[in-house]
A protein has these predicted regions:
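Negatively charged, low-complexity tracts enriched in Asp/Glu with abundant Ser/Thr
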Residues: 1-22
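Intrinsic-disorder/low-complexity loop/linker signature
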Residues: 20-21, 34, 49, 88
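Short aromatic-glycine-(Arg/Gly/Cys) micro-motifs in beta-strand/loop hairpins
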Residues: 26-56
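Generic low-polarity alpha-helical segments
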Residues: 24, 36-38, 68, 72
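Short, exposed beta-strand/loop patches in secreted or surface proteins that constitute
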Residues: 16, 28-29, 59-62
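Mixed-charge, Lys/Arg-enriched low-complexity segments
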Residues: 1-7, 47-91
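Generic "edge-of-domain/loop-turn" microfeature
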Residues: 14-17, 23, 33, 45, ...
Length: 91
């Protein structure tokens, strides 16, 4: 199970091939005073320079960690890859 302390953001980014197309993805979960925010971002790698036209960016909020985890996993996240974000955080 994923463990988060208050105001901590965990997740990862990756380049992955999906249906023959390489895409850049970001997955994240943040705990904030009993609520859990999720972040999902994806854009085709060959469209990174035009991301605003091709990206999908989603922010969601949940009252339970289990619901946040189920949601982010439904987007393709692998919880085993989640780690503390360093530098620029998506949430």
């Amino acid at each position: 199970m994923l463990h988060l302390t208050n105001l901590q953001t965990k997740g990862y980014d990756e380049l992955i091939e999906i249906n023959g197309e390489v895409v850049y993805q970001v997955f994240a979960i943040k705990k904030n005073n009993g609520t859990y925010s999720t972040y999902y971002y994806t854009v085709p790698k060959n469209k990174l320079d035009q991301a605003e036209d091709y990206e999908i960016e989603e922010f969601n909020e949940f009252n339970e960690l289990e619901l946040a985890i189920k949601h982010i996993q439904s987007k393709g996240a692998n919880l085993l890859r989640f780690n503390i974000f360093k530098g620029n955080k998506p949430l």
